[in-house]
A protein has these predicted regions:
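Signature of multi-pass transmembrane helix bundles
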Residues: 1-69, 84-85, 182, 195, ...
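Small-residue-rich segments of transmembrane alpha-helices in multi-pass membrane proteins
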Residues: 29-31, 91-99, 158-169, 188-194, ...
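Transmembrane helix-loop boundary segments of multi-pass membrane transporters
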Residues: 51, 70, 117-129, 146-161, ...
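Helix-loop-helix junctions within the multi-pass membrane cores of secondary transporters/permeases
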Residues: 83-85, 92-163, 348-429
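Hydrophobic alpha-helical transmembrane segments in multi-pass integral membrane proteins
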Residues: 169-177, 228-238, 322-329, 402-403, ...
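C-terminal membrane-solvent junction of multi-pass transporters and transport-like membrane proteins
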Residues: 179-186, 211-220, 429-458
Length: 530
């Protein structure tokens, strides 16, 4: 009885803490939308749509809180357990096979990926399958890197070099989608698992003295694979015949509350039922795989398995509430705001500022971002603060969305951003501690999660559609996720470069303090006697 009471008290206090964190995360986006509504910046933004947005914001806070509690003690725990166990087998083929299966399973089940795939118009199963294969293969490369102590920088140069070689023969219309596919794979299901899997594997190989560095980098490599596999897929598709089909969300068309509430509750029911199935499909394969793997190879105590399953339920229902609320209230509002700004003349500057704000505040609300920055602080033993990384990521993502809006308006190729951006990012990787490079590339993948695909992307699509028409959406609107994924690579490594320079200056000042003028005289005296 006392144990149950203590457990309930712990859950209550943990939930209240996560509730407060989630509220602070979502509040800035609510503030931006509220300012736009009350100032009348968006003409077609009615009170019913605003009220539905507020209701969904409350649901997002609740869902995010439940997910964060559950993910820490379920998906992260499973990833670490399997990661530690795999290396102990000492059989490379077994490690490779299991890693590939895990990579494919967690990817094809990622809800974030399904949201993006539904907006493209390509066969969803084919697209998701190719992305899953890409993630599986490149997680294998990441695991082999840890086992054989290979340099992460060199791997990034080789793989991104291959990406830009394939970009030369990929249809420009499909190129932004290829780059976006690398970002949307790393969402709330994939990231906690892969991060913990890498940490568990790195802990098992800690004798090489690189455990901290090796804990990161898997998510980054997992983001490269889908870019390559989707580029290959595009070579076999009739890309030129693809047309984006715009559809207005019925909930944003109501100017009064007459008939609104029945439509709202009907749509809410459809979204929640849909997410119950989608998230169930997302989490079930990983859970079943863990139970079978544990039964055969680990044989954990029943108490630990039950605890993991209970927390998996928290994560499940939290993710259901989060995604349903985002799709119900956030996506249509973001689309409407973008459409309204694109339809007005002279609003590019406002669109850039609003897009930057959405990116900046949206990344704070990303479930997977909280998982990553907590692990960064843990692995670095507090030397890299989670608050600092979160702040830097938010600034970089805001800048990335602003650049995406500029590209959507002027319509130039995404390669004008990607090529110099990755040259800078890869160049910085040779100037900063390797752990910063691994953290930066992981941050890029994590930042482009469900808030990006369901809030930022619809905003950019709405803006592009209204400004230039449906025919320009594929080539100009898509690519926003790729920009969100790119900017943290530069900014987080820039943070590492700043830390390096600051350390060098401090060391120089210390040496200078101990170097007195009399020392020169003594040296000179000795030389004279010689």
């Amino acid at each position: 009885m006392e144990a149950n009471a203590a457990s309930k008290t712990f859950f209550r206090s943990a939930f209240l803490l996560k509730l407060r964190e989630s509220f602070v995360s979502v509040l800035p986006i609510v503030a931006v939308i509220s300012i736009l509504f009350f100032t009348g910046v968006i003409a077609d933004f009615g009170l019913p749509a605003y009220i539905s947005f507020l209701i969904c914001s409350v649901l997002i806070v609740i869902g995010l809180s439940l997910f964060n509690i559950g993910a820490e003690a379920s998906m992260s725990a499973i990833g670490k357990i399997i990661g530690e166990s795999l290396f102990k087998k000492r059989k490379i083929f077994f490690v490779v096979a299991m890693t590939f299966i895990i990579g494919v399973l967690v990817t094809i089940a990622e809800p974030d990926l399904k949201v993006t795939a539904s907006q493209i118009g390509v066969d969803e199963l084919l697209l998701i399958g190719m992305i899953g294969v890409g993630v599986g293969l490149f997680v294998v490369f990441g695991v082999l890197r840890i086992i054989f102590n290979k340099n992460l920088n060199i791997m990034f140069i080789c793989f991104y070099g291959l990406v830009f070689m394939l970009a030369g023969i990929t249809n420009p219309k499909f190129l932004p989608i290829c780059f976006d596919s690398g970002g949307v794979t790393t969402g709330p299901v994939t990231v906690p698992f892969i991060l913990a899997f890498g940490a568990g594997l790195a802990a098992s190989t800690a004798s090489n003295g690189r455990s901290g560095e090796d804990s990161f980098g898997l998510t980054a490599l997992a983001s490269v694979g889908p870019i390559l596999t989707v580029m290959v897929l595009s070579l076999f598709l009739d890309v030129d015949s693809m047309v984006y089909v715009w559809s207005d969300n019925p909930l944003t068309t109501y100017e009064t509350f007459e008939g609104f509430w029945p439509a709202f509750f009907s749509s809410a029911g459809e979204h929640f039922l849909g997410e119950l199935g989608m998230v169930g499909i997302a989490i079930a394969p990983t859970t079943v795989f863990y139970l079978i793997y544990d039964l055969i190879f680990i044989k954990s105590r029943r108490v630990r398995i039950v605890r993991i399953l209970i927390n998996m339920l928290y994560a499940y229902f939290g993710l259901v509430i989060f995604l349903a609320a985002v799709n119900l209230g956030f996506l249509p509002v973001a689309q409407e705001v973008g459409k309204g700004l694109g339809a007005s003349e002279g609003t590019l500057g406002i669109a850039i500022l609003i897009g930057a704000a959405f990116g900046l505040f949206g990344v704070i609300a990303e479930p997977a971002v909280h998982v990553l920055i907590r692990q960064i602080e843990t692995v670095s033993e507090g030397t890299v603060k989670s608050l600092t990384v979160g702040f830097v990521m938010a600034l970089s993502v805001g800048g990335g969305v602003a650049l995406a809006i500029i590209r959507a308006y002027y319509g130039f190729s995404i390669l004008y951003y990607m090529i110099p951006g990755y040259i800078i990012a890869l160049g910085l990787s040779f100037l900063v501690p390797k752990i910063y490079t691994a953290m930066a590339f992981d941050s890029g993948g994590v930042a482009s999660g469900p808030m990006a695909s369901t809030f930022v992307v619809p905003f950019v699509i709405g803006f592009t559609y209204s400004a230039h028409g449906a025919e320009s959406v594929f080539e100009n609107a898509f690519g926003a996720v790729a920009m969100i994924a790119l900017m943290p690579l530069i900014v987080v490594q820039g943070m590492g470069l700043y830390a390096n320079i600051k350390r060098s200056i401090n060391n120089y000042m210390v040496r200078k303090r101990f170097h007195e003028d009399d020392d020169l005289v003594i040296i000179s005296f000795e030389e004279a006697n010689a």
